[in-house]
């Protein structure tokens, strides 16, 4: 977790000059962005690699810079993307979720409007839910990635946007998604306009609800009945907006053996 206040001011001054000179502006022009420190950002610490400074930007970071975003710093993670700090911005006695917690906190606390997280097993979604922002686990290959220092890490994880609302999340995804010739696993698909249908509503959508995702009751930790009830009420409340909500009770094979096998290939 590193703050580059001086560098951010320099980038902001350059962004101001670009406006004054009538230069072409990118979709993130002048917007502060924080990057989870498992991502490589030139000149910043990479917590995953245990390096105080790396000498290159990964592809998503390149695209943020090109779009005019101002990278003000990196957010805290921890070994194997699990940590003791930071704490929940709403209550310091509560946990803010797992590894992308630093990015979630930076967004929710108003430090930045946009951040990048990482998700392999809920690492973006849980901090977003627990801290109160939007977090997206992107499909494999949607956001290209190449890192020759830890090539196996992204076999289970993908980079994704975190923001205060769906529109901002879509805006950041618009910038970082799309194929790149350096990543042979990148999806070779055109990037749609992710903001185009945000105001369309959910009438007619089919939405599935499960209280354990098909395996947690049988194989994992017990659920909180209160949390399950609140989320279930929220899910079925979507029917009032025209969605078709269906409860499913499928039971899947336990995922942990496969996850543990993949994890053995993670660096460190």
Where are these regions (language model features)?
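Short low-complexity, flexible loop/linker segments enriched in glycine and/or proline
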Residues: 85-90, 129-132, 255-267
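Generic structural signal for helix capping and beta-alpha/helix-loop junctions
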Residues: 79-81, 123-124, 217, 255
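Alpha-helical scaffold segments in soluble metabolic enzymes
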Residues: 14, 63-66, 138, 168-175, ...
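Fold-level recognition of mixed alpha/beta catalytic cores in primary-metabolism enzymes, strongest
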Residues: 86, 105-210, 223-226
């Amino acid at each position: 977790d590193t703050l580059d206040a001086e560098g951010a001011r320099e980038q902001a001054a350059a962004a101001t000059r670009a406006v004054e000179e009538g230069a072409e502006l990118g979709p993130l022009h002048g917007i502060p962005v924080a990057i989870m420190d498992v991502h490589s950002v030139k000149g910043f610490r990479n917590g995953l690699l245990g390096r105080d400074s790396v000498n290159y930007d990964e592809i998503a970071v390149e695209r943020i810079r090109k779009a005019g975003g101002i990278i003000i710093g990196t957010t805290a993670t921890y070994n194997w993307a699990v940590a003791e700090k930071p704490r929940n911005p709403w209550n310091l006695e509560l946990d803010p979720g797992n590894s992308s917690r630093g990015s979630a906190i930076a967004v929710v606390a108003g430090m930045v409007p946009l951040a990048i997280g990482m998700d392999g097993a809920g690492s973006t979604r849980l901090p977003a839910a627990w801290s109160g922002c939007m977090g997206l686990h992107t499909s494999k290959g949607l956001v290209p990635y190449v890192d020759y220092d830890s090539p196996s890490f992204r076999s289970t994880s993908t980079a994704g946007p975190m923001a205060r609302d769906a529109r901002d999340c879509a805006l950041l995804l618009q910038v970082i998604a799309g194929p790149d010739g350096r990543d042979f696993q990148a999806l070779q698909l055109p990037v749609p306009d992710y903001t185009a249908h945000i105001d369309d509503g959910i009438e007619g959508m089919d939405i599935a609800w499960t209280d354990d995702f098909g395996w947690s009751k049988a194989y994992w930790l017990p659920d909180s009945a209160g949390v399950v009830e609140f989320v279930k009420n929220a899910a079925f409340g979507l029917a009032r907006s025209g969605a078709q909500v269906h409860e499913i009770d499928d039971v899947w094979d336990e995922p942990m053996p496969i996850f543990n096998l993949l994890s053995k290939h993670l660096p460190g």
